[in-house]
Regions:
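Histidine-centered active-site loop/cap adjacent to the catalytic His
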Residues: 343-360
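Short, solvent-exposed beta-strand-terminating loops
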Residues: 97-108, 255-270, 329-334
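Structural recognition of the beta-strand scaffold that forms the well-ordered cores
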Residues: 92-104, 139, 163-168, 201-206, ...
Length: 360
């Protein structure tokens, strides 16, 4: 009887719905990114965290590597810092996003390394080492303000201390951003290093790659996705505007999926991994074709248009303590470098995420 009760209790824990899933949704159609399942239960989250912690220890801190083609060339100590701007007013840095913001596999030299999140190397939120060997936004800001807080300190998962104010989650989609914003505000506000009302905060939002890569082809009405993206971004930005004083938001464009997954003559490992990482574009699981890829590409273009319009909308303009700037990061991205049509050293082992060099 005792064993039976324990089993029932454990099953009950796993079947509990997610604590943030009780909000009624106003969207006309409920698509796959709006749904919660048994996998969102509290028990499953605990199990997932345990599994990730186990993998973290197995893989090890790959972000500490100091040699490899995936790393940028170190800038010599006799080369002065090239910028001459006043950025010292920014005291807090944070970020929200998916595996690109988590710098998944940035220091990967093999398949297993892709399980590691090298957050200290992420271009928008990584603060490992310094700008000479890890040229990231936080490491540049630290030149002007050594007391900057919030940047990721090294390899970490979201629940690790070294993640700091990097709220990114692997597999995250647009639907997750409002929740991330609430969690981020709580984390920053509770940090004793932060002067909540006086410190200026820089937040980078980069999301959407998984929507276009893995979910758009599973939806009944995929053309509605940009409108949903608009509502979620508006909800997120309004929450930050109303709840976090002195905030500057970098809204980064959705990454260009086709420029990566449609590369020609990819290594076999990359081709194989792309079937899982971007199944709406690669393989036959969802009857991918040139026609379907063109359809997804148009939806991605709408994502980009929506993001630009939101950043430039009147409700986020002319405010004393809040601003949004659109960063068209992926629009002109190119893999050409060092005389190569595609320099794979800019990409991680899976040719999908960015290497440390690519982040720099």
């Amino acid at each position: 009887m005792l064993l039976r009760c324990c089993v029932i209790s454990v099953l009950g824990l796993f079947l509990l719905p997610g604590t943030y899933s009780g909000v009624a949704r106003k969207d006309t159609h409920v698509d796959i990114t709006d749904q919660t399942t048994l996998l969102d239960g509290i028990g499953m989250r605990a199990a997932f965290r345990f599994l990730r912690s186990w993998m973290f220890n197995i893989v090890g801190r790959t972000g500490q590597r100091i040699s490899g083609s995936f790393l940028q060339e170190q800038i010599p100590s006799d080369v002065p810092f090239p910028c001459n701007v006043s950025l010292g007013d920014i005291n807090v840095i944070a970020a929200m996003g998916d595996s690109l913001t988590a710098a998944t596999g940035a220091a990967a030299s093999g398949f297993v390394d892709l399980y590691q999140e090298n957050r200290g190397l992420a271009w928008s939120i990584g603060g490992q080492w310094n700008w000479r060997n890890v040229t990231t936004l936080p490491n540049i800001l630290k030149v002007f303000n050594p007391k900057l807080v919030g940047y990721s300190l090294g390899d970490a998962y979201p629940f690790h201390r070294d993640s700091q104010f990097n709220m990114a989650e692997i597999g995250a989609v647009s639907y997750d951003i409002p929740y991330m914003a609430r969690a981020m505000v709580q984390r920053i506000r509770n940090d004793p290093r932060v002067d909540w009302k006086r410190d200026w905060k820089l937040v980078t939002i980069a999301i959407g790659g998984n929507d276009i890569c893995s979910f758009v082809c599973t939806m009944r009405y995929p053309e509605q996705l940009p409108a949903k993206h608009r509502l979620r971004l508006q909800r997120t930005l309004r929450y930050l505007r109303n709840n976090m004083p002195r905030t500057f938001v970098n809204l980064v464009s959705v990454p260009s999926v086709s420029k990566v997954v449609m590369l020609q003559r990819k290594p076999f490992a990359c081709e194989s991994l792309h079937h899982g990482e971007c199944s709406c574009w690669i393989g036959k699981l969802y009857n991918q074709s040139d026609s379907s890829r063109e359809r997804w590409s148009k939806i991605q273009d709408e994502y980009i248009r929506v993001e630009k319009e939101i950043a430039e909308s009147a409700e986020f303009r002319g405010l004393d303590e809040f601003a949004v700037v659109y960063q068209p990061w992926s629009l002109n991205v190119s893999m050409k470098m060092n005389g190569k049509d595609t320099d794979y050293s800019l990409l991680s082992y899976d040719c999908f995420h960015m290497s440390q060099k690519g982040n720099a």
